[in-house]
Design a protein with these regions (language model features):
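Soluble or luminal CAZymes and related metallo-dependent hydrolases
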Residues: 20-22, 60-69, 112-116, 159
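Catalytic metal-binding/acid-base residues of hydrolase active sites
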Residues: 43-45, 92-94, 136-138
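Alpha-helix C-cap/termination motif
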Residues: 31-33, 75-79, 126
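Structured beta-strand-rich core segments of catalytic domains in phosphoester-bond hydrolases
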Residues: 1-52
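Active-site beta-strand/loop signature of hydrolases that rely on acidic residues for catalysis
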Residues: 39, 69, 73-97, 132, ...
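A residue-level structural signature of the nucleotidyltransferase/glycosyltransferase Rossmann-like core
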Residues: 1, 84-86, 160
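Metal-dependent phosphoester-hydrolase catalytic domains
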Residues: 12-15, 96-202
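Surface-exposed cleft-lining segments at the edges of enzyme active sites
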Residues: 44-67, 104-109
Length: 202
């Protein structure tokens, strides 16, 4: 993962989680006319295949990572530095019923289990994050950013999940002017299984 910018970066930090230096959280600070803007770029651990932290170390690590995410943002909130923040990245959790092709069939599948959804909700509450995508696309509508390589025809089967997210703090909501998931990119030659997610901020 990386953060690329045409604008100068004032500060860049790689935040450590679970005593691992694998660069899963890059924080970048920009100077803007309205004050500092912090962008948090995340790649949350996928969690393996078995949604049981007692027998799956990868899943236990994912839950611990989410706990530390929450603690990190609560610390930012206590320091009163939370005004202009954007969170982006592959969070490897599809929290809503219509963020997956079948909530019933995936409820015990890693990325859509209750324990992950609850942990992500705590992260979101830690800084009053707003899930921008669902301000543009109602929660009652299907919305995906990822389709498995295993599907013979990903577009026809459309068994996707919304694993990639953009959140903003309340102070930035009025500046958000557009949102889009570039679904067609999934059909390019040798594509990623994730489609680009775009946010326009005025």
């Amino acid at each position: 993962m990386a953060t690329l910018s045409r604008l100068p970066m004032v500060e860049t930090n790689i935040v450590t989680y679970c005593n691992r230096t694998d660069g899963r959280h890059i924080e970048t600070v920009f100077d803007t006319a309205n004050g500092p803007l912090h962008i948090h770029n995340f790649y949350v651990p996928a969690g393996g295949d078995e949604p049981d932290p007692k027998i799956n170390e990868k899943f236990a690590h994912k839950l611990a990572f989410l706990d530390e995410m929450e603690a990190n943002f609560r610390a930012i909130r206590r320091k009163k530095k939370a005004k202009r923040q954007i969170l982006v990245g592959d969070l490897n959790i599809a929290p809503g019923e219509h963020d997956v092709w079948s909530s019933k069939q995936l409820k015990n599948v890693v990325s859509h289990t209750a324990v992950e959804i609850e942990a992500l909700a705590r992260v979101q509450a830690s800084l009053d994050w707003e899930d921008v995508s669902r301000r543009f696309v109602p929660a009652s509508e299907k919305l995906y950013s990822w389709w498995s390589y295993r599907a013979r025809d990903w577009a026809a089967s459309d068994r996707g999940r919304r694993l990639d997210h953009i959140w903003v703090t309340p102070a930035l909501l009025d500046d958000v002017t557009g949102f889009e998931i570039l679904r067609d990119a999934r059909g390019w030659e040798r594509p990623s299984d994730h489609a680009p997610v775009v946010l326009d901020v005025g």
